[in-house]
């Protein structure tokens, strides 16, 4: 049994090959770019401001998210660990791209 469900709010766009597992909430109108992997323990780092803001288990509303990595030190050395990066906020141009995908699905057109 899942301790905490996956919650995907309204008008979220999920790109190809994304993985979202238990304990993650994706808030309304967020955009997950291709290959984003989110677990309850995945660092979600907002890099849009002067200083990074770190989230775990939640993608804020209207965030545009892509896969990324950060450096973590281990006994054997420094290695890159996967994370998700918030690189911006959903804009009108993003809405147009996602509405095109909706239209293609509605009319069963493969692209």
Give residue ranges: language-model regions.
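Terminal amphipathic alpha-helical/low-complexity segments used for targeting or macromolecular assembly
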Residues: 56, 61-63, 67-111
């Amino acid at each position: 049994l899942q301790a905490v469900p996956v919650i995907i709010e309204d008008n979220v766009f999920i790109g190809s090959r994304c993985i979202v597992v238990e304990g993650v909430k994706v808030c309304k109108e967020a955009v997950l770019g291709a290959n984003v992997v989110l677990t309850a323990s995945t660092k979600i780092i907002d890099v849009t401001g002067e200083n990074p803001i770190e989230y775990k288990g939640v993608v804020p509303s209207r965030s545009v998210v892509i896969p990324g990595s950060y450096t973590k030190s281990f006994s054997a050395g420094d290695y890159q660990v996967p994370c998700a990066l918030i690189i911006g906020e959903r804009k009108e141009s993003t809405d147009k791209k996602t509405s095109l995908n909706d239209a293609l699905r509605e009319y069963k057109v493969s692209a």
